[in-house]
């Protein structure tokens, strides 16, 4: 059987037009059974029997026979869509069999809340009673009240746009003054208008302040505001905050608002999910290149072993910046060439040593140790080079003329 025969049989059996029959068959890839089921879903059987013919339709004379036997000049008006009642289709509508297609009719019913009380039945044949299930969690009654109020006062985004100020698209008007007419009366001024959005002015008493927006999330184990922490339902203080919100008052510390400040609270229903703390980006602090690495001091812990660490300098050293006073161990010979070496100390201070080129690295270590005692090493920051406490290497041999050194604690 080709498609034309299937289309003809489908239209004759269901009393529909050829265009309608072709639509249903093409929608189901010319599957006769699926097309019939789809037709029953789109046009239920009770709609055809529930229609009452209007006065105009009742006046149309009934035509019997095939269309080839019709004669006359006037064209027959299109007959209303009719379909024979399918007894099998009514049997499927009883609810025993599942539908193959979901239509808009299935979505017309109101959404039932998952927390509605269930009705139970008890008793015998003649003493049956309908018992309403108790509240599983009476602490969440305030949450249900707030959600119900939020549902009743829901405003669509289109309504918010319509209720917004219409003055943004209007033009502002002002007055101008001709040059050289400062002493004339104000009535001689010429009005000037400018199209486009007006300039934003700070809010005044006549201009209402724009309300803040806060999002209130209700989770399975508590509630939260925006990305803030969770407040459990078991805490009596949190129950008091819910009572404030239910009465239309905003807790200042919870919503982060000031007194008499307008606020819009958006309620999000997440009762089927547990609260998960939002991801926070990494936060920390950096360390300057060449800064001191302080070894942590170990302490005695209960049940643990005591570890003794090397003693480090914990007493702050008062070092004046750019101090050029030499240490007593540095004997400066004014007749020999001298140089200045800047040392950045481990405690954040800085000192400047005046030495001869004949002084050794050991002399520099002793001078720095007198200012900032402890175990340390001296290094050149760039190019990176560590200086050993060597009494045989002079300042000139180490190329430390006008150099900058860094003290690093061990």
Curated annotation (Swiss-Prot):
Looking up PROSITE patterns in the UniProt record yields: SEP, UBX
Which residues does UniProt assign to the signal peptide? Answer: none
Output compositional bias ranges, type Low complexity: 65-85, 163-174
Q: Which residues fall in a compositionally biased region of kind Polar residues?
A: 86-97, 183-196
Chain segments carrying region Disordered: 46-139, 154-212
Q: Biological process GO terms, please?
A: autophagosome assembly; Golgi organization; meiotic cell cycle; membrane fusion; nuclear membrane reassembly; proteasome-mediated ubiquitin-dependent protein catabolic process; sporulation resulting in formation of a cellular spore
**What GO MF terms are annotated?**
ubiquitin binding
- Domain SEP, first and last residues per copy: 211-276
Q: Which residues carry this modification: Phosphoserine?
A: 156, 167, 186
Q: Which GO terms describe its cellular component?
A: cytosol; nucleus
Give start and end of each UBX domain. 334-410
Q: What SUPFAM superfamilies does the record tag this protein with?
A: NSFL1 (p97 ATPase) cofactor p47, SEP domain, UBA-like, Ubiquitin-like
Q: Which residue spans adopt a coiled-coil conformation according to this UniProt entry?
A: none
Q: Does the keyword Phosphoprotein apply?
A: yes
One family name in Pfam for this protein: UBX
InterPro entries assigned to the protein according to its UniProt record, in alphabetical order: NSFL1C_SEP_dom_sf, SEP_domain, UBA-like_sf, Ubiquitin-like_domsf, UBX_dom
Keywords, alphabetical: Meiosis, Phosphoprotein, Sporulation, Ubl conjugation pathway
Gene3D superfamilies reported for this sequence: DNA helicase RuvA subunit, C-terminal domain, Phosphatidylinositol 3-kinase Catalytic Subunit, Chain A, domain 1, SEP domain
* Residues with the Phosphothreonine modification: 190
Summary of subunit composition and partner proteins:
Interacts with cdc48.
Please explain the role this protein plays, according to its UniProt record: Involved in CDC48-dependent protein degradation through the ubiquitin/proteasome pathway. Involved in delivery of substrates to the 26S proteasome. Also required for membrane fusion and sporulation.
Full protein name = UBX domain-containing protein 3
């Amino acid at each position: 059987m080709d498609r034309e025969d299937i289309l003809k049989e489908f239209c004759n059996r269901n009393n529909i037009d050829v265009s309608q029959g072709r639509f249903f068959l093409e929608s189901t890839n010319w599957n006769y059974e699926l097309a019939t089921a789809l037709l029953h879903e789109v046009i239920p059987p009770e709609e055809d029997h529930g229609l009452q013919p209007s006065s105009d339709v009742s006046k149309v004379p009934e035509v019997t026979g095939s269309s080839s036997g019709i004669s006359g000049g006037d064209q027959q008006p299109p007959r209303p869509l009719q379909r024979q009642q399918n007894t099998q289709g009514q049997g499927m509508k009883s609810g025993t069999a599942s539908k193959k297609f979901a239509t808009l009719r299935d979505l017309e019913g109101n959404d039932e809340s998952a927390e509605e009380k269930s009705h139970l039945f008890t008793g015998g044949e003649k003493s049956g009673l309908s018992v309403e299930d108790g509240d599983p969690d009476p602490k969440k009654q305030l949450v249900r009240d707030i959600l119900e109020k939020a549902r009743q006062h829901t405003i669509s985004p289109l309504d918010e746009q319509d209720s917004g100020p219409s003055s943004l698209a209007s033009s502002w008007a002002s007055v101008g003054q001709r040059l050289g007419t400062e002493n004339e009366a104000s009535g001689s001024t010429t009005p000037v208008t400018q199209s486009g959005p007006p300039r934003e002015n700070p809010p005044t008493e006549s201009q209402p302040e724009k309300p803040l927006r806060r999002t209130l999330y209700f989770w399975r184990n508590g509630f939260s505001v925006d990305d803030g922490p969770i407040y459990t339902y078991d805490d009596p203080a949190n129950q008091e905050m819910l009572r404030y919100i239910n009465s239309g008052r905003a807790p200042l510390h919870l919503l982060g608002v000031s007194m008499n400040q307008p606020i819009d609270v958006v309620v999000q229903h997440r009762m089927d999910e547990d609260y998960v703390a939002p991801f926070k980006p990494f936060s920390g602090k950096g360390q300057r290149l060449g800064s001191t690495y302080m070894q942590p001091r170990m302490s005695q812990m209960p049940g643990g072993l005591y570890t003794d660490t090397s003693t480090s300098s914990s007493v702050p050293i008062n070092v004046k910046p750019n101090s050029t006073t030499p240490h007593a161990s540095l004997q400066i010979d004014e007749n020999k060439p001298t140089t200045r070496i800047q040392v950045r100390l481990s405690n954040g201070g800085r000192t400047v040593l005046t030495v001869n080129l004949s002084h050794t690295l050991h002399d520099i270590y002793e001078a720095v140790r007198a200012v900032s005692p402890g175990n340390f090493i001296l290094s050149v920051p760039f190019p990176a080079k560590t200086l050993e406490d060597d009494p045989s290497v002079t300042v000139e041999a180490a190329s430390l003329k006008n150099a900058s050194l860094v003290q690093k604690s061990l």
